[in-house]
A protein has these predicted regions:
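N-terminal Rossmann NAD(P)H-binding glycine-rich loop of SDR-like oxidoreductase domains
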Residues: 1-20
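SDR active-site strand-loop-helix element
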Residues: 4, 28, 60-61, 98-104, ...
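Adenosine-cofactor binding site in Rossmann-like domains, unifying the SAM/SAH pocket
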Residues: 26-45
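NAD(P)H-binding glycine-rich loop region in Rossmannoid oxidoreductase-like domains
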Residues: 39-79
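NAD(P)-cofactor binding segment of oxidoreductase domains
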Residues: 71-99
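Catalytic helix-loop patch of NAD(P)-dependent Rossmann-fold dehydrogenases
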Residues: 78, 82-83, 106-147, 151-154
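NAD(P)-dependent short-chain dehydrogenase/reductase
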Residues: 136-184, 190-198
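Mid/C-terminal beta-alpha module of Rossmann-like enzyme folds, strongest
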Residues: 195, 202-251
């Protein structure tokens, strides 16, 4: 199995869980991985995949910064969509199973409700648009699985994850924008990884297509951050109430 984006928040957790469960796995990232590779150099990416011929590729790579996706839509499309199209082509050629990690960012302005795979989607910004395009590329391949989710956890290096950003903001008494109109069913990366590995290891009845993997609970970003502050005993009076439509203030 090859995991693309193995040094990211989810990639790190998935690599660790895979090895604990005795999976043969190769982590790929630009640096500090089993294989250092710029996956946007598509020629090198294809040659690498051809040389390894894995049974499964898990794509954890994405630009998730909402502001960056708005500022540079071409880059967002390249990473969130076009890369997936390239992976589909090589996976189809070599009959490799492709697992593409997507997002729950399509469910906006419909309140506190749970969603299934048939729930209507809303492409509210460039992040949602490019991730949805990536889904469509992946789903054009019969031997693929697209997973919509909202994972939370720690990266411990590089740009802060949402959880790390929240902790840092609370600790340093920074202003935090709390979105009341964006609900999620966030799941921690380690629980998600264990579920995904069970799906990959499932014999006979292989799951393909589109599925959601999430928490059984639903809350908006305001509720999530306020609960987080209570659990970690942080008092922060610099909360601003905002809307996801404004984009500013949220790091996913």
């Amino acid at each position: 199995m090859i995991i693309l984006g193995s040094t990211g928040m989810l990639g790190q957790a998935l690599i660790k869980a895979a090895r604990l469960n005795n999976f043969k796995v190769i982590g790929v990232a630009r640096s500090n991985a089993d294989v250092a590779l710029d996956v946007l150099d598509f020629e090198k990416l294809i040659l690498f995949i051809e040389s390894k011929k894995p049974k499964v590729i898990v794509n954890c790579i994405a630009i998730t910064d909402l502001n960056l996706c708005e500022a540079n839509p071409e880059k967002a499309y390249l990473v969130n969509a076009h890369l997936v199209a390239v992976l589909v082509d090589i996976c189809r050629e070599l009959n490799i199973r492709l697992i593409h990690i997507s997002t729950d960012h399509f469910f906006v302005n419909d309140g506190n409700k749970k969603h299934n795979e048939a729930s209507p989607t809303v492409l509210v910004n460039n992040y949602a648009k490019t991730k949805y395009a990536g889904e469509q590329f992946a789903l054009s391949y019969q031997n693929s699985l697209v997973i919509r989710t909202n994972v939370v956890g720690f990266r411990n290096s590089g740009k802060h994850t949402f959880i790390e950003w929240v902790l840092s903001s609370l600790k340093n008494q920074k202003e935090v924008t709390l979105f009341q109109d964006f609900y999620t069913s966030s799941i921690d990366v380690y629980t998600f990884s264990e579920i995904l590995l069970k799906i990959i290891d499932k014999e006979g009845d292989i799951i393909n297509g589109l599925i959601n993997i999430a928490s059984s609970e639903v809350c908006n970003k305001e509720q999530f951050i306020r609960k987080f502050a209570i659990v970690f005993n942080y008092k922060n009076n610099k909360f601003n109430i905002g809307s996801i439509m404004s984009i500013n203030g949220l790091n996913r």
